[in-house]
Swiss-Prot record:
Keywords: Flavoprotein, FMN, NADP, Oxidoreductase, RNA-binding, tRNA processing, tRNA-binding. Catalyzes the synthesis of 5,6-dihydrouridine (D), a modified base found in the D-loop of most tRNAs, via the reduction of the C5-C6 double bond in target uridines. CDD domains: DUS_like_FMN. The gene is dusB. The active site is at C100 (proton donor). It comes from Proteus vulgaris. It is an enzyme of class 1 (oxidoreductase). This is tRNA-dihydrouridine synthase B. PANTHER family: TRNA-DIHYDROURIDINE(47) SYNTHASE [NAD(P)(+)]-LIKE. FMN binds at P16, M17, A18, Q70, K139, N200, G201, D202, G224, R225. Its cofactor is FMN.
Length: 323
């Protein structure tokens, strides 16, 4: 699949997830087989551009793979400026968020709230496309509510504005993450536009990935929550798409190696204090199926020191492997 001048190594993309897809996680997903990763959402509000939080979220020119940054906002001028700043800082693709269902985002008429205002959508898309020399992509939901599904209208509008790929999450804003994603809307969009379509929502395993590609005709898949604590899902899916065979479960020793490397990189990237706090949620996701009683996770979450976190993980796996 191509986005503008960029050829992805495969059709699997790691979704932008606030508080999750930081640089260490993006690098890990890329190493584990993702064809591209997208940064967590960056606000277009100029008042926050120079904060430590925003600087950590930006991509840098030394990152591996195609560097895509997602921006969010409702002011066309601010969005264009944010796109230019990120492109100048190393972003090779700018992704526009019109799919986030969070209330705090929607209250500012950003994220999926924009789907109710096609005229403003067109202004924002045109402003961003005209502001940068890199490809611009868009991520949306199928609409505001089941009674207001307008993804086909938005897709056609996006194509006219110069958007070079469109990701669609198979739920409306009203649905949040409840129930199951539906793919009929994605299939219909694919039949009505010529730009690449990326299907998103509930793609949890290789069989589901194959089924969604076949049913929707999508050019690529975007995988989000299923990669939390299981970044090797990209490798599993790609192997199945290539061979029709499922890989065996990842050996626990390899899970340990991946997790400990990830935790070390979080410590290095954020520093000991913030790094240890952020590591807690990732370790919880990794160990979901291995520590169902939560006992280890509770004790791990009380650890404040980075080296103690790594020692605790080492001891946990030693005990686990002895069982």
């Amino acid at each position: 699949m191509r986005i503008g001048q960029y050829q992805l190594k495969n059709c699997l993309i790691a979704a932008p997830m606030a508080g999750v897809t930081d640089r260490p996680f993006r690098s890990l997903c890329y190493d584990m087989g993702a064809g591209m990763t997208v940064s967590e959402m960056l606000s277009s509000n100029p008042q926050v551009w120079q904060t430590d939080k925003s600087r950590l979220r930006m991509v840098h020119s030394d990152e591996l793979g195609i560097r895509s940054v997602q921006i969010a906002g409702s002011d066309p001028v601010d969005m264009a400026a944010a796109a230019k700043i990120n492109a100048d800082s190393g972003a090779q693709i700018i992704d526009i968020n019109m799919g986030c269902p969070a209330k705090k985002v929607n209250k500012k008429l950003a994220g999926s709230a924009l789907l109710r205002h096609p005229d403003l959508v067109a202004e924002i898309l045109s402003a961003v496309v005209n502001a940068v020399d890199v490809p611009v992509t868009l991520k949306i939901r199928t609409g505001w509510s089941p009674d207001e599904r307008n993804c086909v209208e938005i897709a056609k509008l996006a194509e006219r504005c110069g958007i070079q790929a469109l990701t669609i999450h198979g739920r409306t804003r009203e649905c949040l993450f409840k129930g199951e994603a539906e793919y009929d809307s994605i299939r219909t969009v694919k039949q009505n536009v010529s730009i690449p379509i990326i299907a998103n929502g509930d793609i949890t395993d290789p069989l589901k990935a194959r089924a969604v590609l076949d049913y929707t005709g999508a050019d690529a898949l975007m995988i989000g929550r299923a990669a939390q604590g299981r970044p090797w899902i990209f490798r599993e899916i790609q192997h199945y798409l290539d061979t029709g065979e499922l890989l065996p479960p990842l050996p626990i020793a390899e899970v340990q190696q991946i997790m400990q490397k990830h935790v070390r990189e979080l410590h290095d990237f954020y520093g000991q204090g913030k790094g240890t706090r952020i590591a807690r949620k990732h370790v919880s996701w990794y160990l979901k199926e291995h520590a169902p009683d939560d006992q280890f996770r509770r004790s791990f979450n009380a650890i404040e020191d980075a080296s103690e976190q790594l020692e605790a993980l080492e001891a946990y796996f030693e005990n686990f492997l002895r069982k």
